[in-house]
């Protein structure tokens, strides 16, 4: 028996609405120096991406894109204990993105985008993140424009969309 599309859409919307609530419960329980990698996986699930670090630690990306406005990077030491936890979609981190940075460098800094689009006529690969906005009636997006020829950052921009 096939489930009607509208029922699937309702369950997807409920899941998206509950995800931030899960973060509100789970994130305060993750404590650097105490929480184990197994506990993080149990509470948060599998990370969207894992970055290996030179010192043997690993950083796990817990991204809430495209609907959320946060991305948590949790660094696990070689002893399997949480070292740090940081919400990386911040004005300070967005300001660190510079011309020429690679896609990997950008992802490492602020996590994976909520959407991607290639504009051949502009020679750009566009990555977009939903970020915290000024008012609840607006959605704010941070955009990184990568040059298709070089692969590096060409520029950054923002756009604001009114909800409703």
Descriptions of predicted regions:
Residues 22-164:
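Residues within mature, well-folded domains
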Residues 1-20:
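Sec-dependent bacterial lipoprotein signal peptides
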């Amino acid at each position: 028996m096939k489930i009607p599309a509208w029922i699937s859409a309702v369950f997807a919307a409920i899941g998206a609405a509950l995800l931030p609530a899960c973060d509100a419960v789970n994130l305060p329980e993750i404590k650097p120096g105490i929480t184990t990698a197994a506990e993080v996986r149990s509470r948060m699930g599998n990370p969207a991406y894992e970055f290996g670090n030179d010192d043997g630690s690993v950083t796990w990306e817990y991204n809430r894109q495209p609907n959320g406005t946060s991305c948590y990077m949790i660094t696990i030491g070689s002893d399997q204990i949480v070292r740090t936890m940081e919400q990386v979609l911040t004005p300070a981190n967005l300001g660190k993105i510079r011309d020429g940075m690679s896609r990997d460098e950008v992802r490492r800094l602020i996590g994976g985008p909520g959407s991607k689009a290639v504009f051949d006529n502009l020679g750009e690969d566009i990555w977009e993140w939903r970020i915290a906005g000024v008012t609840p009636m607006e959605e704010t997006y941070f955009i990184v424009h990568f040059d298709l020829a070089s692969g590096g950052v060409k520029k950054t921009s923002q756009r604001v969309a009114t909800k409703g």
